[in-house]
Amino acid sequence: MKDFADIPALMAEIGTAAKAAAAELAFAPADQRAQALTAAADAVWARRDEIIAANARDLDYGRDKGLSPAMMDRLALDEARIQGIVDGLRAVAAQDDPVGAVLSEWDRPTGLHIRRVRTPLGVIGVIYESRPNVTADAGALCLKSGNAVILRGGSESFHSSSLIHACLRDGLRAADLPETAIQLVPTRDRAAVGEMLTMTDTIDVIIPRGGKGLVGRVQAEARVPVFAHLEGICHIYVDADADPDKTARVILNAKTRRTGICGAAECLLVDRAWYDRNGATFIADLIAAGVEVRADDTLQAIPGTVPAKADDFGREFLDMIIAARVVDGVDGAIAHIRRYGSQHTDCILTENDATAARFFQRLDSAILMRNASTQFADGGEFGMGAEIGIATGKMHARGPVGAEQLTSFKYLVEGDGTIRA
């Protein structure tokens, strides 16, 4: 696998190796897979200085490419973020094993006993952009769920991802599992992405994690099934019955904690009655924190806001920018989100149970929240240890994609010489 100039041959070899590894992983004991993840976590921590040095090369590359501050933040690793990678690997290792779990079982009058049990999907292809931690998250979750994985990281994170991948291979080797269970495409050549999208003989599902351009290309060109992770155009609606203290706290966190993640709030909707009664001091708080608030005609009365343009609504800024407008009640908020949202994560701030129920019932985002920061839209925060992404489609996986979502199922039917009449 040394001739990287012949991309089709390279990818065919990777695919064949992954398929063979998947067949072995399907019956590998749970404790063996967990051992690999624990050993990988130890390797990541032991090599943290090397990873940070490799990341510095990636950051230089990103600066030369003119990456935005948000993209540079996604790319950056320090000791605290590496500790997060290690913690994620260990958390996934400690989870209950999804493979072989009995989802349901029943007896039929014919004498048959039927069980529905979880099984791995097979080989998963993950295509992602600048976040090197996805290398660890995706590798861990696929291994936990008994799947082989082919990782194609962004060119920006090439050096960081390569070192993290080496640690994952160390873990596989320590547990006596095939090192080809987790493979990283060893070239920045974009032709590798095109090959992955057509590898129907060896890849069972593709998961793209990145911006609209990447996801759109995958959806348009893939001949392999896709779990789509679309933009995080996350809304927060301040209802007439919102608690002022909770509102101020949640909005500031949802926008400013980390602007470059898909769970960052991008649009603020304010109930007209609330605004008439209370104003919107939380907008002043955002401005004081350095956020550019692009406001509609009504909210432009607040000093420091700037006029919103039509295309500011329905836009993922991934920056210290938020769009804001006044709406007429919860139904106005629902109508706006249906038009401009990406079905990722949307939040209502209210103390009114009936209004919250209406918001939950009439929107179909993958994640709906009440009185909580949209930055909780994360598999780790959901107790999954890690995530590959937030699936916004409606087929198979939806919301945070953890190990359980990377499985299918099969039926095990037992009889006793039973025949059909």
From Swiss-Prot:
Location of this chain's protein in the cell: Cytoplasm
GO molecular function: glutamate-5-semialdehyde dehydrogenase activity; NADP binding
One GO CC term, this protein: cytoplasm
Pathway stated in the Swiss-Prot or TrEMBL entry: Amino-acid biosynthesis; L-proline biosynthesis; L-glutamate 5-semialdehyde from L-glutamate: step 2/2
Alphabetized CDD domains for the sequence: ALDH_F18-19_ProA-GPR
PANTHER family the UniProt entry points to: DELTA-1-PYRROLINE-5-CARBOXYLATE SYNTHASE (PTHR11063:SF8), GLUTAMATE SEMIALDEHYDE DEHYDROGENASE (PTHR11063)
Protein name (Swiss-Prot/TrEMBL): Gamma-glutamyl phosphate reductase
Gene behind the chain: proA
